């Protein structure tokens, strides 16, 4: 899980490039390695263009002249997905969330010629601030943040009703919760219990 390439494709927590390739009409990858550009291509999950040296991507992909990095270009297989499977709002929401999860990274979505870019300098801190702003609420105390090579945790308390708990593993949403989310929630409740007043009672459902 700690390998950079593993983190990028989502490891076992998501389909990554393998799943995308298997469900795409075509998938092309162009990448720069040690100053040289290489390309590999697939159709319907089958290799059609073995790795070969090529030139940097340009106007062909509408990304401008790239000097380094990797470009992945694919088309979802229409026999598997319908147009309704990819509403623009879903793509915009995904790009916006990825910007929060990867501070400093700019993501640009191009929908029918209209571009929209997303960037976050503060990452999860910015996300929480925007959520509080949407609720017209302010955090009651300084935001708690913890981060190391394995995890980043951000917690804020406000005077708004209810709560919002979101978890992500390698950039992929844990929509059904799971061990990662449950462990953080349990630790938070345990910490609150140690500081509660003698007449106050809390449970995991509070």
Task: For the regions a language model picked out, list residue spans one by one.
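GHKL/Histidine-kinase-like ATPase module
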Residues: 53-60, 89-92, 96-99, 104-206
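GHKL (Bergerat-fold) ATPase N-terminal catalytic module, capturing the glycine-rich phosphate-binding loop
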Residues: 1-75, 81
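Catalytic cores of large soluble enzymes that bind and process phosphate-bearing ligands
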Residues: 8-12, 19, 83-87, 119, ...
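Short, charged, solvent-exposed linker or helix-capping segments at domain edges/interfaces
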Residues: 39, 83-86, 165
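Short, polar/flexible loop-turn hinges at active-site or ligand-entry regions and domain interfaces
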Residues: 4-7, 78-87, 175, 198-202
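Flexible glycine-/small-residue-rich
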Residues: 23-24, 31-33, 74-76, 111, ...
